[in-house]
Amino acid sequence: MEKEKTCKIVFSDIDGTLLTSDGQITEGTKEMILNLENKGIPFILTSARSPEGVRVIKRMLGNHAPIIAFCGGLILDNDGNEIYSKMIPLKRALELKAMLDKDFPAVACNTFGGEKW
């Protein structure tokens, strides 16, 4: 008899995945997430958004799991405490910005520190 495979955790992007084209979450999706959480399966929101941008969706869901923001650059627990952060050292970031300004002047750069863009 084959052992039943069980899901231990679910990760989901937000924009274009979890949200409808008009920025809503369907009742069916909310129900599915609640069912997962009732089974003890964390539903982790992941996004390129800032932490506050992820928290907006987290509040819509009543979600109590950690969040992954800035494309994985920052992971926070349910209370907003940092679990993981990967920053580019300031000196290196300034070198990259100078190179982009020189070679690709039309490219826009976004930076973040902590929870701010």
Model-predicted regions and their roles:
Residues 2, 13-15, 22, 77-79, ...:
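Acidic-enriched, low-complexity/disordered segments with a strong bias for Aspartate over Glutamate
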Residues 6-23, 96:
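Asp-based phosphoryl-transfer active-site loop
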Residues 27-117:
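Active-site phosphate-binding/coordination module
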Residues 2-9, 25-27, 32:
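Mg2+-dependent phosphoryl-transfer enzymes with acidic/Ser/Thr/Gly-rich catalytic loops
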